[in-house]
Amino acid sequence: KPVSVIDDGTVSEETRLGAIGDIQFAIDKKGIDSDMVVIAGDNLFTFSLKKYYEFFKAIQTDCVCVKPFGDMEMLKQFGVAEIDENGVLIDVEEKPQEPKSNLAVYATYMYRRETIPLFKTYIAEGNKPDAPGYFVEWLCKRKQMHAFMFEEECYDIGTPQSLEHVSKIFEAKRM
């Protein structure tokens, strides 16, 4: 399907909708009533979206991408997932002070059609509209979700410093 850019009209920090508010804005603006993929624009990854999508279709639940992460201090900057032996999410906590596992959740989500109305519910209940991980934290307490485990690379390039760091990593690989 073609990709389209949707402008929410925000011109300042004070009027921004937040990531979850922007997702709801896109749902309303485009009349989305189907399964949906949400990928943060500041993610750079090398895993296969096709494999992830095939997993999503086979498992028939909402899914998140997770990867084991070695640096427990850095893990505090991510969503952290706890899963059972079948890959079912038991809990997700966004940016925990004390991570309960070493599984980082990356902002690449696949949602089933029946989940789409829950974005509006989440916002109406007054929940945090910022990071999309807060929605996952809320959602996994209401319905079954699965974790897609990957081992390839995934980086957050949302700051000039992290973009420069990742650029150096990829430049070194080309040599």
Give the ranges of each region predicted by the language model.
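Catalytic-core segments of class I nucleotidyltransferases/pyrophosphorylases
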Residues: 44, 53-57, 88-156, 160-175
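Conserved beta-loop-beta/alpha segment of the NTase-like Rossmann-fold superfamily
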Residues: 1-83
